[in-house]
Amino acid sequence: PLRRQRQMCIRDRTNLVLANMKGFSNGPFLDKDRIEQAGNDNVSALKIKTPSLNEVVGQLSGGNQQKVVIGKWVNTDADIFIFDEPTRGIDVGAKIEVYRVMNDLVKAGKCVIMVSSELPEILAMSDHVVVMRGGRVMADIDRDTPHFNSEDIMKAAWGGELD
């Protein structure tokens, strides 16, 4: 997300389960053991580099902060995940981990929608591209069509018609 700093308001391991608090509560109380287990699982699965689960998220690198935000949502039972500029401002290693998480979600039968301004990323990660301009759909392109290329996607983004 573009505003990952704002989305990390909780300072400890609770942050990793924030989007699914019902799944980690026992009546009105949080199940700290389950939260800790989920935190350990996320740190391991997402390869989050942190000295402890209680580390202030803002002290982590940008890539690790991004993985915490993603981990929060992976803990939900959602079928659709929207990634808005998921790799902006993070290093190559963290990008690879984010891509892996997205691919794992797809393999698990989840729908992943990625919004990105990085065209190579879109071409590498997408099976289907919808190009929008000014709130209007300019093109709807499947990977197996001849229009699934940088030139045609940019043409549509600038308002041009595809043949």
What are these model-predicted stretches?
Residues 1, 120, 148:
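Short alpha-helical
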Residues 5, 15, 38, 152-157:
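Amphipathic alpha-helical interaction/coupling elements
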Residues 12-138:
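Helical hairpin unit composed of two closely spaced alpha helices linked by a short loop
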Residues 25-26, 136-162:
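Conserved beta-strand-loop-alpha-helix hinge in the C-terminal portion
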Residues 1-6, 10:
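Single conserved hydrophobic/aromatic residue that forms the stacking wall/gate
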Residues 40, 162-163:
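A short, hydrophobic secondary-structure junction motif
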